[in-house]
Amino acid sequence: MSGRPKLVLASGSPRRLSLLNQAGIEPDALRPVDIDETPTKGELPRACANRLARAKADAALRALQIDDELRGSFILAADTVVAVGRRILPKADLVDEASQCLRLLSGRNHRVYTAVCLVTPKENFRQRLVETRVRFKRLSEEDIQAYIGSGEWRGKAGGYAIQGIAGSFVVKLVGSYTNVVGLPLNESIALLGGEEFPIRAGWLDAG
């Protein structure tokens, strides 16, 4: 490749894009992929996040191999899993799913895992998994019903968005906050920088 290498974010998540922008990085393209995100039987949360991030990266790479403009780009993919013990919570799309998640999380500790997978222009894969521990306050029925009414939970792992109203539910957080939002910035930028992507190129324009 000549000139600045290109970066493709293999996600349609506004949160992941916003986090990259926060770090001064503007992807050249967004290429969300459609894969089956159902955990396999007995799959552990860590393994699930790692498998799905790799599957998203693989799918994006296949798509870009036939794209003359973006072939040879860096590809960044990620998957976030919320778990209570070994139980993986869904990415809630239905009210019943979100209600069940919130009742399970109420007053308890849970863990958020995000796996980040980077594909280099030479089609090498680099991957990191980040874990954050979160504890929610005990949620009242009024809390749950009002939060369901907000709609903020739709499509979110574990049925909540920490960067929104649900941030007020958090009693304690140990680890990376951006990991819970959907993309651990420190580790993601380290992956890119380790493969000589110009991570600081946009900093002069960040102000």
Curated annotation (Swiss-Prot):
Keywords (A to Z) from UniProt: Cytoplasm, Hydrolase, Nucleotide metabolism
Any one cellular-component term (Gene Ontology): cytoplasm
Annotated GO biological process: nucleotide metabolic process
SUPFAM superfamilies linked: ITPase-like (SSF52972)
EC number: 3.6.1.9
Protein's cellular compartments: Cytoplasm
Catalytically driven reaction(s): dTTP + H2O = dTMP + diphosphate + H(+); UTP + H2O = UMP + diphosphate + H(+)
Pfam family name, one: Maf
PANTHER family referenced in this protein's UniProt entry, alphabetically: BIFUNCTIONAL DTTP/UTP PYROPHOSPHATASE/METHYLTRANSFERASE PROTEIN-RELATED, BIFUNCTIONAL DTTP_UTP PYROPHOSPHATASE_METHYLTRANSFERASE PROTEIN-RELATED
Name recorded for this polypeptide: dTTP/UTP pyrophosphatase
Lineage: Bacteria, Pseudomonadati, Pseudomonadota, Alphaproteobacteria, Hyphomicrobiales
